[in-house]
Structure formats: structure tokens, C-alpha cells
Amino acid sequence: MARLNGTRAVVGGLAATAVMTVLMLMAPAMGLPPMNIGAMLGSVMGGSVFLGWMAHFVIGTVLAIIYAAVFATRLPGPGFLRGALYGLVPWIVAQLVVMPMMGAGPFGGSFGAGFGSLMGHLVYGAVLGGIYGTTEAQAAARPAHAHV
């Protein structure tokens, strides 16, 4: 079993969260409902959009560490595919637990919101898996003396 690389997990989580964030902020340009995650999370944190964005990136990083520790070596396929499959886990939790807690109903109350969120989480997972999986494979391929 491969050992968890915390640095790669954190870097992958931050990068994946950033890419997902950009995609979701661009949702209206793609005909999907607006998805301002910072404002949405901030609404349950005293209205602070800044705290909402901080929470979003912390959650993305924690989810990346969970991926690296539990799922990265247990899912089939290349890193980006393993990550995309993993992206389904937080998407389902968000749609069935988080969205109703925020008053939006399951799947954000509409097909567009649920679909947009699905795309965001799949991209998050693919980026995470690509970063974590690729570097893991590269690290495994290096001879031990290359670290000198």
C-alpha cells in the first residue's frame, strides 16, 4: 500500500478547489444557475463571504487528504479517473445533506444547479487525481538514490 503524501494531497486539493471554483463562477456563461460557493457557505457563517471562501478551500483540502488516505489506491484506472470517481462522493453528500441544510433542497432544487455542481465536483476530482496520481507514479518510478 502506498504511503500518504500529505504535501501532494494539500497541493492537489488547493489546485482542484481553485479549478472547481473558477468553473462554478463561470456557470452562468454556460447557461447554468449562478454558483457562488463563498456566498452560499458564508450565509451560514454570519454572512461573511470571506469566511465562506475560506471554508470552501479548507473543505477542498480536507477532502483531498481523505482521497489520498483512503481512495487513491483503491479506485481503478489512471489518477484523473480515480479522482473523478471520488468527486462523486462529495457531490452526493453536498446534494443530499448540505444543500437541504442551506434551504436549497436536494440537488439545489433544480436540474441545472445539480448538474452544474456535478460537473464542478467531477472536475475537482479529476484535477486532484491527476495531480496526486501523476506525481505518485512519477515518485514510484524514480530510483531511491535520485533524492540525493
Question: Where are the predicted features?
Answer:
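Juxtamembrane/disordered regions of integral membrane proteins
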Residues: 1-148
